[in-house]
Each structure stands twice: as C-alpha cells, then as structure tokens.
Amino acid sequence: MNIDLAALNAGTLWPEYIVTITLIVVLLVDLISGRKASWSLPYLALLGLGIATATLLPMWILENPVSFLGSFTADPLSVVFRAFILISAALTVLMSVRYINQSSLATAEFYVLLLGATLGAMLLSGSSEMAMIFVALELLSITSYLLSGYAKLDKRSNEASLKYLLIGAASSGIFLYGMSLLYGFSGGQTQLTEIAPRIVNLGFPALLSLVLVAAGICFKLSAVPFHQWTPDVYEGSPTPVVAFLSVGSKAAGFALAIRFMTSAYPGFSEQWQTLFVLLAILSMVLGNVVAIAQTSMKRMLAYSSIAQAGYVMIGLAIGTQEGYSSMILYIGTYLFMNLGAFMAVVLFSLRTGTDEITAYSGLYQKDPFLTLVLSLCLLSLAGIPPLAGFFGKLYLFWAAVQSQAYTLVFFGLVTSVASIYYYVRVVKLMLVKEPSPQVLAYSEAGDQDGIQTLKAGMLITTVATVVLGILFPPLISLADTSLRATPSLQQVRTATPVSRVSTGAQAPADHGR
C-alpha cells in the first residue's frame, strides 16, 4: 500500500516527539555520566515538558487536525487535555526531586517511566482509532504499574504494584474484548467515526460492547465499582507517582471517554448517559462516605479522588456542550488543588516519616507555609468559595440544572456538604489543636537539595487554586471555544439531556451556544 507522507500530517504530534526525545536524552545522560549528572535529570525533564507545552499552542488553530490516516486527532479538545497532562507531569517532577533523593531511588529510571506515562496519556487523549487507543492505553498502563512499584524495597509498594497490575490487566482485557466486538459488528472498521453508523441498529450486541468499553475506561477513572485498586495503590505507591495517577492518568481517561462515547456511540447516547449517571452517583456517595473514616492522609485523598471523579462524570452524563465544558474546567482546577495537596503531603512525610492525619495536629505552629498550602487546597477540594474548586462545582451543577438532571444535582450537593467534614477536619487539626509528637520533632530542612523545587511547586499550585477562581469567566469561554472547534462534538448541541432519560422531565431542545 502506497502512503502519501504528506497525508500523514505528522506535525500534529510535535509535543509527543519532544517528550520522546526528552526521554531518550535523560537515558543517554544517565548512561554516559552516571551519578555525576543525576542532579540535572529532573531539570532536563522539566525543560522537555515545557517545550512540549509551548508547541501545543499553535495547534489550537490547525486547519487539518487529523493525522496518521485518522489514527490521531489534534483538535482543540485533545490540545486541552494534552496540556493538562503535561502540566501535571511537570508539577510531579517538581515534587519528586527531594523525594527521590531522600528515598535513595534510582533517578533516571523514574523520570524515564514518568515521561513514558506522560507520552501514553497524551496519545490516548487524541487517539480516534481503536488500535492506536489500545497501544496508547497500554503504554500508559505498563509505565504506571512500574511506577507504582518503583520503591522495590518497600513491601507496600510491591503489594500496590501487584494489585494494580492484576486488576489493570483484567480491565484491559475487558476493554479489548469490547473493542473486538465493535470491530466485528462494524464489519472490520477501526475508526471510531466509521463504526457509529454501522452499529446504530444493532441493539443489544452494541450495548454489550458499550458496557465492556465503559468498564475498561472507568478503571482509569477510579469510578465505583471499578475503584478497588485505588486506596491500596495510593497508600503503597511513592507519593509523586500517586499524584500523577490522580490527575494525569485520570485526565487521559476522561478524554478517551468523551471521544469514544461521542464518536462510536452517538446513536446510544441515552444508554451511556444513563450508565454514567449511575456511576457518578455511586462514586460521589461511596468516595465521600468512606473518606470520612480514613486515618491516613493518602487513603483519604484516594477516596476523595473517587468522589471527584464522580463530580466530573456529571458533565459526561448530561452529554451537552455545557456538560463537557464544565468537565474541562473542573479537571483544570482539580489538577492544581489536588497536586498542591499531594505536594504538602510529600513535604510533611519527608520531615516526619508519616502520613497519619492525627500527626498534622498543631502544624501551624511549626510550619505556617505548609499549613496555608494544604488548607487552601483541601478547602478548594471541598468546594469552599472563593477558591477555584467552588466555581468548578458550581458550573458542573449549573450545567446539570440546565439539562434538568436534578437527581445528579441533589447527590452532588449532598455529598459535597458531607465532604466538607473530612477536609475541614484536617484544617482544624493543623490550626487549633495542640502539636502532635511528630510536629514537635518536626525538622525543617530548608537547605536540602530539592526542597526549594518542592516549595516552588507548592507555591504555583496554591496561587493557581486561588487565581483560577477569580479568572473563571474567561476560562469558561476558553472551554466553550475548544468544544465548538472540535468536529466530533458538534452533534451534542442538540443531544437529548439526561433528564429526559432518567427523570422523564421535559428537556430543552438545544443547549448549544
């Protein structure tokens, strides 16, 4: 088969090329210079991630975003999610420098695996063909398994990696089986947009493939009931790895969910919207209720991430322009407030050796900066105004009200109120309680290598958590623009709102702007 190289439109993958080159450079520098140059590896990774982010900007206005014979689409939707993934990877690098030095872990391999996971997540965000989707998903998954077990001398890390691998392999098998059904039912098509018209009249067989594909995607989202791996993996894995999995991997999963559902299953929108309504409610309820009983900060944030996935799924479940726009905005704000919280946990655990919630008691007396960062990030996760998390949830609930999805709004509001308890409990401990033994023995290592990069990351995430709340109106316009410029999402302007499916309410005819 003759392939026109110009038709490949390979320039749309420049950010991915740069991440790949950075990965190779990190390997070569470590191979040639060894430990002498290990200090430079995180900064090389940061440089590469920064350049890759900069190369995304011109892609916002690409005339032809389709590349590699339809396997990859660099539309504005993928540009936004790839930017989220690159930013989360860069912030993970900032928080990992001191952590790796103090934990005596191999430096080069960590950044190579992190860049590999970043590459897989970016490719997954723009993939529009099933073979490409599976390859990108496995690249992200395999590097994530290795990262979760990176502290190989730690039994908890080994256990976390094994659980993640076994459950992840099962979910990949389920996802692949769902795609194989699609391949057969569509007469051998692998392009998502080509599959849709060929399965629209199939009925139950197509619904079976839909359920299997959704199950595989929901594993990446940590959505209930596919969440069992999350608490153990979050508790046992190195904290910087957990931070990336909670944001970068999840962002790629949501990008895949939007593209797969709107491109391959537009004729089954009522069915998959109803499915995601149930998953969103289960995730919000279980995540927030179980988080209340946690005594470990990392396990609490694990269940918090399950609940946060439920909130984001509100936008996916209602299936309108406003819903997808609110998803994008909430993921963007969640990126900074969640990574900021994990950075604070990293710094505290490095100085005390524990992540128990009670150990944070009286922290304000010893470290006001750390207390401020963690408090603002937790309050933003709780949805307290005027922080970014409040406006993100407000826009999600507003989009649900516009679609008359009152059941989702009810559960979202009730669980948000419940979440305030376990977030504010930590803030109260730090501010008004007597110092714990760990805080009394707290050692500030301000002159240690890597602490300043960690503090810089904490400052960036905290400022973003506050400022994004102030800049929310222009961000809404940006998200709406990205959706209007994405061809595969044009049909959702007149999509049936979820309320007509779940409550039987009369829905407005058009939610387009």
Swiss-Prot record:
Protein name (database record): NAD(P)H-quinone oxidoreductase subunit 2
Lineage of source species: Bacteria, Bacillati, Cyanobacteriota, Cyanophyceae, Gloeobacterales
E.C. number: 7.1.1.-
Location in or out of the cell: Cell inner membrane
One GO BP: photosynthesis, light reaction
Domain of life: Bacteria
Biased composition (Polar residues): 494-505
Keyword field contains Membrane: yes
GO molecular function: NADH dehydrogenase (ubiquinone) activity; quinone binding
Keywords: Cell inner membrane, Cell membrane, Membrane, NAD, NADP, Plastoquinone, Quinone, Translocase, Transmembrane, Transmembrane helix, Transport
Membrane-spanning ranges: 12-32, 41-61, 77-97, 104-124, 130-150, 165-185, 199-219, 238-258, 272-292, 300-320, 328-348, 372-392, 394-414, 456-476
Recorded family membership: Belongs to the complex I subunit 2 family.
Provenance organism: Gloeobacter violaceus (strain ATCC 29082 / PCC 7421)
Enzyme class: translocase
One Gene Ontology cellular component annotation held by this UniProt entry: plasma membrane
Membrane topology: Multi-pass membrane protein
Catalytic reaction(s) noted: a plastoquinone + NADH + (n+1) H(+)(in) = a plastoquinol + NAD(+) + n H(+)(out); a plastoquinone + NADPH + (n+1) H(+)(in) = a plastoquinol + NADP(+) + n H(+)(out)
Region (Disordered): 494-513
HAMAP family: NDH1_NuoN_1 (MF_00445)
Assembly information from the UniProt record: NDH-1 can be composed of about 15 different subunits; different subcomplexes with different compositions have been identified which probably have different functions.
Entry-linked InterPro entries: NADH-Q_OxRdtase_suN/2 (IPR010096), ND/Mrp_TM (IPR001750), Ndh2_N (IPR045693)
Covalent S-S links between cysteines: none
Keyword NAD: yes
Function per UniProt: NDH-1 shuttles electrons from an unknown electron donor, via FMN and iron-sulfur (Fe-S) centers, to quinones in the respiratory and/or the photosynthetic chain. The immediate electron acceptor for the enzyme in this species is believed to be plastoquinone. Couples the redox reaction to proton translocation, and thus conserves the redox energy in a proton gradient. Cyanobacterial NDH-1 also plays a role in inorganic carbon-concentration.
